[in-house]
From Swiss-Prot:
Domain Toprim, first and last residues per copy: 182-268
GO molecular function: DNA-directed RNA polymerase activity; metal ion binding; poly(A) binding
Catalytic activity: ssDNA + n NTP = ssDNA/pppN(pN)n-1 hybrid + (n-1) diphosphate
Name the record gives this protein: DNA primase DnaG
GO terms under biological process: DNA replication, synthesis of primer
Subunit structure: Forms a ternary complex with MCM helicase and DNA. Component of the archaeal exosome complex.
Keyword line: DNA replication, DNA-directed RNA polymerase, Exosome, Magnesium, Metal-binding, Nucleotidyltransferase, Primosome, Transcription, Transferase
Binding residue positions for Mg(2+) 1: E188, D230
Principal EC category: transferase
Enzyme Commission identifier(s): 2.7.7.101
GO annotation, cellular component aspect: cytoplasm; DNA-directed RNA polymerase complex; exosome (RNase complex); primosome complex
Length: 399
């Protein structure tokens, strides 16, 4: 560790990746000098927080930067200020700041350290960048004058686009406010995250494909989730997968045919204002689906769908038999239950329902969904993890 004294300041190895700057004040009952303060900081915090937050180790690895100490004595007492730069995250920086306040002695004297504030260095830099950019635009460009508010917005949008981070074990593209926000917005890809950041929305994270990452699933258990997806079939597919594995609270969609990454600020805000609770979405989907089913079954004016399925249930119950039904709920094929999976796999039949005297398994649900069936009716549910929204699963006792 290297240290030197310049103009009353003790400095240590600099760190150009500083995120936060701890500002603290110190007061000692007696005359103390700078080396006493530094010795107390390192000596009295050593071993206090374990190896991961040991000050000496943090400085060796560059996770804390130059420590500034300024102190003066007056009337037999000493007063001063301490600044500790940190490239740790918010929580670790706060713990480090709290550790400073546990120091009770400096040299031979009783002392007290109090944290005054923790400065977000990057936020301060961004503010200076905006102010300097405004001056540069005014001084060095001969174009017609731009309103100050517009200049600020242009520069801020550019800066926000640089705020993208990698989040979770899958290193998902995200805004910087995921951890601190109670609500998050889930989008499809990195370009969507960048567009929302550009317009000031920081609690956004991308799934990066149709296979929903574990990080998204875990976040959905703790936070209010709005799925904000493209207004096309790709958005439909991602939404379907999200609803199966994650706890989604609201759904927002881009205008039909548009992608989230191309939306203007006005379109983004309008889409988010018009978000729909997921419960309402299911009702709308159910009504639309039942409407399609009524059209398919137009040739059956007297019997409801439930009545017809109930009749088929009575026919297979106790016989270990399965029936595959067409769009009008007429029997296409009747087979032993043990042959049902094999028949569905090997036959390219287009049916509407499966009614069988057996247990509804995840394997059978996946196969029925793949074959685009609308209903599957069985004795009871087995170990089922997820059910596609396109398939309605019914047990005998529900009919």
């Amino acid at each position: 560790m290297s240290s030197d004294m310049e103009g009353g300041m003790i400095t240590m190895k600099a760190n150009d990746t500083t995120k936060y700057l701890i500002h603290a004040e110190i007061e000692a009952e007696g005359v103390v000098e700078r080396p006493d303060v530094v010795g107390a900081i390192f000596g009295q915090t050593e071993g206090l927080l374990g190896g991961d937050l040991d000050l000496r180790e943090l400085q060796k690895t560059g996770r804390i930067g130059r420590i500034e100490v300024k102190i003066e004595s007056k009337g037999g007492r000493s007063f001063g200020e301490i600044k500790v730069p940190s490239s740790l995250d918010k929580v670790e920086t706060a713990i480090l700041a709290a550790a400073l306040e546990t120091i009770e002695r400096v040299g031979p004297c009783s002392a007290k350290i109090k944290v005054l504030k923790i400065e977000d260095v990057r936020a301060s830099k961004r503010k200076r960048i905006v102010e300097r950019a405004m001056n540069i635009l005014r001084e060095h460009f001969e174009e017609p004058e731009i309103e100050s508010e517009r200049i600020v917005e242009i520069v801020r949008q550019a800066i926000r686009a640089d705020e993208i981070v990698e989040y979770g074990e899958e290193k998902l593209p995200a805004g910087p406010a995921i951890d601190e926000s109670d609500a998050i917005i889930v989008v499809e890809g990195r370009a969507d995250v960048l567009n929302l950041l550009k317009h000031g929305i920081k609690n956004v994270i991308a799934v990066e494909g149709t296979n929903i990452p574990k990080t998204i699933v875990e976040l959905s258990k703790k936070k209010t989730v709005t799925a904000f997806l493209d207004g096309d079939r790709g958005g439909d597919l991602i939404l379907k997968e999200l609803l199966q594995v994650a706890e989604v609270d609201y759904v927002a969609r881009a205008p039909e045919g548009k992608e989230v990454e191309d939306l203007t600020q006005k379109e983004i805000l309008k889409s988010l204002r018009n978000k729909v609770p997921v419960e309402q979405l299911h009702v709308l989907k159910k009504e639309a689906k039942e409407g399609r089913e009524r059209e398919k079954l137009a040739e059956m004016p007297k019997d409801s769908i439930s009545d017809v399925l109930r009749k088929h249930t009575e026919s297979v119950k106790g016989r270990l038999t399965a029936r595959v039904l067409d769009r009008n709920l007429n029997v296409i094929k009747e087979v032993p239950v043990r042959d049902l999976v094999k028949i569905l796999k090997t036959n390219n039949m287009k049916g509407s329902a499966i009614v069988f005297d057996g247990i509804i398994t995840q394997r059978l649900i996946d196969l029925a969904a793949k074959k685009e069936f609308d209903y599957i009716v069985g004795v009871r549910l087995g170990s089922v993890v997820k059910v596609p929204t396109s398939l309605r699963v019914i047990t005998f006792d529900q009919l």
